Each structure stands twice: as structure tokens, then as C-alpha cells.
Amino acid sequence: MKRIAVLTSGGDAPGMNAAIRAVVRKAISEGMEVYGINQGYYGMVTGDIFPLDANSVGDTINRGGTFLRSARYPEFAELEGQLKGIEQLKKHGIEGVVVIGGDGSYHGAMRLTEHGFPAVGLPGTIDNDIVGTDYTIGFDTAVATAVENLDRLRDTSASHNRTFVVEVMGRNAGDIALWSGIAAGADQIIVPEEEFNIDEVVSNVRAGYAAGKHHQIIVLAEGVMSGDEFAKTMKAAGDDSDLRVTNLGHLLRGGSPTARDRVLASRMGAYAVQLLKEGRGGLAVGVHNEEMVESPILGLAEEGALFSLTDEGKIVVNNPHKADLRLAALNRDLANQSSK
């Protein structure tokens, strides 16, 4: 394979630029040419495809977002869009493509694979909800950003004896809420993967103030309900604290990526190039126990799939993604309502 392309699709995530940089420079080191596709699958279909060189990705590793830009393009789910995209790739002499994005992006890569066009997926999403990998590109930065802002909210909540409900992104996954909540010393963490009792939530808040707490923070994953709705539910259940709601929202997607995200993205990007060089498409790159692994993208893009690693190093797809609820149990132990 002598010429490949790279695109970013779906929601942006810190570290995408680092992944693009790794794809470009690793490919060049292997004697391959690299093209960039602007605005994901939309740019593929419309032919917004252009050559990249080492200078094209200079000074990008520290930048958030994606300089290739991103777009959601549901038309690519249709056969006509897929065939137009492949036609444009072949028109530019491209033999394989690296797709950086979330599960929707993986579905697009799966369609390319079904049509016999080699595609390799990289997990780029802050939600950490992609199967086939322990961590996704952007997750670590999103957690760090959430923790920074939770720390700031702790300052103001302590000054006014307030309870804060802080909504964080994650779609149907509670990973950001769990990791940031524990790191910020949240009093309660509410995630989609675990049922909660609103009366118990309110009771915990009351017990905390009765024990001498001056403020409380509840971290809420957006997949449960909105922060405003959760606050209304608390009030309906009898909460009488001075309650405020903050939604961190898209703030978690921005900013310079952490060192961990930069390294992870660099490793994954280089690994993807190696797979394409070997003529191996139809795969998604992941990290498992700090080692690079690849999984069949046809399995990972299916609803409710999850990988497990066998003793032979093979990937088995079987169960849906689940946040590590051991973290939820840990937070209940650490957020003792009798302590400040």
C-alpha cells in the first residue's frame, strides 16, 4: 500500500491532532504518501481530499480539536453515499484510510470494509464508550478538564454552603462522571450503568450537612437525565439545600490534550499505519493492559459488542460496554457523609 488517507469524524476529542500527526509521519517514514480528508465522510463524498506532508502536521500535537475538522454525515449510511466516497478515494489513488472517531465513525469504516476498501479505526471520543479498547483518545483530557472545573466549583460551593449538581458528558456511559467524581472528591456520583434512588440521594445530602459539611457536589452523567431535571427531581423528593446546577457540556471536548492522550494517540496512529502497510484493513486499534491490540471492526460496530482478550492474544467480541462500577462503590466508601 503506497497511498493512504486519514479523516476525523463525529464529535471532536483532544488528541485527534496527535493521532493525525502520527499517521502522517509514520506513513512518510514507511515510504507512503498521505492525504487528508476534510470534514470526515462528508469530505470523502464531496472530494475534499488533499495531500499532507510532515510540515502539514507541525505544531499540532499540542492542539485540541482536529485541524482536519469534523462533521456528522448521516448520508454515508446509505449505499449511494458509500459508493461515492469510495469512488473519490480511488480517484485520488488512495488504497486505505484511517478513520478517527466514535461508534458512528466506526460504522462508516465498517461500510468501507464491507465494500472491500481497507479501513482502520482509531477510537477518538471523550466518552470512553468504544468497545475494543481500555481507553479512547480524548478521555483522559476530558476527565482532567472536568476535575479542574469541579475543583473550582468546590471553592464557590464551600463559600456559600451550597449543593452543586454538575452534569458531565458521556452519552450513555458513566466513565467521565466516575473518574472525575472520584478525583474531585464528589459526594455522590450518578451514572447510567447503576440504578439510583432519589430519596437516598436526598437523604445523603441531608446527612452530610447534619454531620457538618459546608458544601456538597453531585456529579451526574448526562445519560441519566439533565442536571436541571435531576435538581427538580431532588426538590420534589424534599431536598431543602441551596441547590445549583452546572453543565460542563462541550467544555470537556476542548483544550490542549494531556500527555497521556498525546502518547496514546501517537501510538495508535503509528499502529494503524503499520496495519495498512501490511494490507490489513477492517480493523480497529485499541489499547489493552497498555499494549496495542486490533479488533475486527465488523464486530465492534455492532450494537452491544465488547472485546475480551484470550490467552492467545485474540479478540473476542461479546458483551456491551460497561463502566467500571467498582469505582462507584469506591466513591461511596470515600465520600463518607460523616466527614467534611
Swiss-Prot record:
Keyword S-adenosyl-L-methionine in annotation: no
Reply yes or no: does the keyword RNA-binding apply: no
What molecular functions are annotated in GO for this chain? Answer: 6-phosphofructokinase activity; AMP binding; ATP binding; fructose-6-phosphate binding; identical protein binding; metal ion binding; monosaccharide binding
Residue positions annotated to bind Mg(2+) are 103
Q: Which UniProt keywords apply?
A: Allosteric enzyme, ATP-binding, Cytoplasm, Glycolysis, Kinase, Magnesium, Metal-binding, Nucleotide-binding, Transferase
One GO BP on record is: canonical glycolysis
Which EC class is the enzyme in? transferase
The EC number(s) attached to this protein equal: 2.7.1.11
Reaction(s) catalysed by this chain's protein: beta-D-fructose 6-phosphate + ATP = beta-D-fructose 1,6-bisphosphate + ADP + H(+)
> What is the regulatory mechanism acting on its activity?
Allosterically activated by ADP and other diphosphonucleosides, and allosterically inhibited by phosphoenolpyruvate.
Q: Which residues form the active site?
A: 127
Indicate the principal place this protein occupies in or around the cell: cytoplasm
Binding annotation for substrate: 125-127, 162, 169-171, 222, 244, 250-253
Identify the domain of life.
Bacteria
> Gene Ontology terms, cellular component aspect?
6-phosphofructokinase complex
Q: Where in the cell is it found?
A: Cytoplasm
- Give cofactor(s), names only: Mg(2+)
Q: Which Pfam families match?
A: PFK (PF00365)
Assembly, in brief, is: Homotetramer.
Role? Catalyzes the phosphorylation of D-fructose 6-phosphate to fructose 1,6-bisphosphate by ATP, the first committing step of glycolysis.
Q: Which PANTHER family match?
A: ATP-DEPENDENT 6-PHOSPHOFRUCTOKINASE, PHOSPHOFRUCTOKINASE
According to UniProt, the name of this protein is ATP-dependent 6-phosphofructokinase
Provide the organism lineage as a comma list: Bacteria, Bacillati, Bacillota, Bacilli, Lactobacillales
